[in-house]
């Protein structure tokens, strides 16, 4: 019975993932369609996506960097659909509130999730801890530009009981820098012919550039662990 249920769910899940991926890669098409379908509620949709991506550790897969860039680009090409300044203001608030909620969830759960659980992967927590070891409290700002780590940084700050006043300062600065830089970059480049013609490639490039720091950290950690394991063999 369980296998039959899983068999029925898997095709729907795959279809949903394909739809999500298509929407992320074609946000230049999706956002105007959402604006036409939902009117001013498009701002609420964008707010909710950014809030969930930053505020809930179970939704790190939602678009962040690419969404901000795309929203700015669409505002440049279709100002009747989106107002870039309103988008920037709302999404700064969404990012601040999201990180704040995430911090308090981490503080509430505390030691119960230090080693991960069925919903929170330990490798994500370890990766975020590594960022804190390297950058300290500035991780709250730097992590804004690193997918997955961005979602887990405020959570780990809460688990580690970082001073909320200190966290809030970094949270506000990070949210402003993140949203303003990416949304206005999209707005500045939105009417550039190359960007308009190759929007999917541009979004892919943003995603790849976003995850490169995490990839380098993982590779460095893997090489360091291999070197540690190999040392005793070399000595013998």
Regions found by a protein language model. Give the residues of each.
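Short, amphipathic, aromatic/basic-enriched membrane-interface segments that mark the entry/exit
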Residues: 35-36, 56-60, 140, 168-173
């Amino acid at each position: 019975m369980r296998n039959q249920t899983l068999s029925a769910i898997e095709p729907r899940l795959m279809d949903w993932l394909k739809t999500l991926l298509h929407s992320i890669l074609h946000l230049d098409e999706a956002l105007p369609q959402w604006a036409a379908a939902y009117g001013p509620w498009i701002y609420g949709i964008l707010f909710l996506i950014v809030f969930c991506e930053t505020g809930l550790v179970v939704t790190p897969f939602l678009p962040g960097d690419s969404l901000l860039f795309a929203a700015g680009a669409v505002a440049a090409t279709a100002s009747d659909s989106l107002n870039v300044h309103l988008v920037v203001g709302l999404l700064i608030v969404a990012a601040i509130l999201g990180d704040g909620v995430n911090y308090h969830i981490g503080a509430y759960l505390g030691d119960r999730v230090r080693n991960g659980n069925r919903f929170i992967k330990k490798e994500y927590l370890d990766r975020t801890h590594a960022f804190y070891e390297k950058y300290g409290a500035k991780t709250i700002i730097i992590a804004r530009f690193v997918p997955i780590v961005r979602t887990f940084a405020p959570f780990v700050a809460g688990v580690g009981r970082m001073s909320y006043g200190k966290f809030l300062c970094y949270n506000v600065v990070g949210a402003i820098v993140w949203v303003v830089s990416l949304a206005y970059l999209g707005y500045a480049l939105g009417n550039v012919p190359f960007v308009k013609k190759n929007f999917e490639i541009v979004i892919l490039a943003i995603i790849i550039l976003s995850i490169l720091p995490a990839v380098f950290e993982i590779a460095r950690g893997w090489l360091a662990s291999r070197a540690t394991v190999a040392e005793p063999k070399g000595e013998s």
